[in-house]
Amino acid sequence: MHITTFSKVQMNPLCPKQEEIRIEDIAHAQSLMTRANGHFPEFYSVGQHSIACAREAIARNYSSRVVLACLLHDGSEAYLSDITRPVKGELSEYRRIEKNMQDAIYVRFLGQIPYDEEMSHITDIDNACLYYEFDHYMGEKLMEQAPLLVTDPAFETLPFAQVEQEFLDLFATLTV
């Protein structure tokens, strides 16, 4: 059982191999995947969200590992898609598969899974960006108190190819 990725790699997403995980596939897929399961009034991609998270980590002066992990934190969605949080919470097997894939991505590009403190920073940034996405697009405040966000992400629809290239360029800068 396999999927065929953008770069024509055939991989089993239930048992990912390091050599099958390619940044080009993640960048391409995320540039085409919408946030909020398509319920925002305009298209805002997972790729744009990931770039915004990485830029926020840079603005907070976090380590290059945390910045790269922020860029990659939704990488599993390139291979598995995503499920909304309320539903995902009920799907323990999916969460296990997603964690396995995400851990494989971290190992592939970071050399290891982020430490607990690093994961805490990644999660904080992810949730802050999510909060401001929903505030901007839906007028909905997901938390009682607005979380810290140092940057000011541009919430706009961008050409897919531009997002893909920006993702790849940022990755290249972070892995020099």
Describe the predicted segments one by one.
Residues 1-176:
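Metal-dependent phosphohydrolase cores
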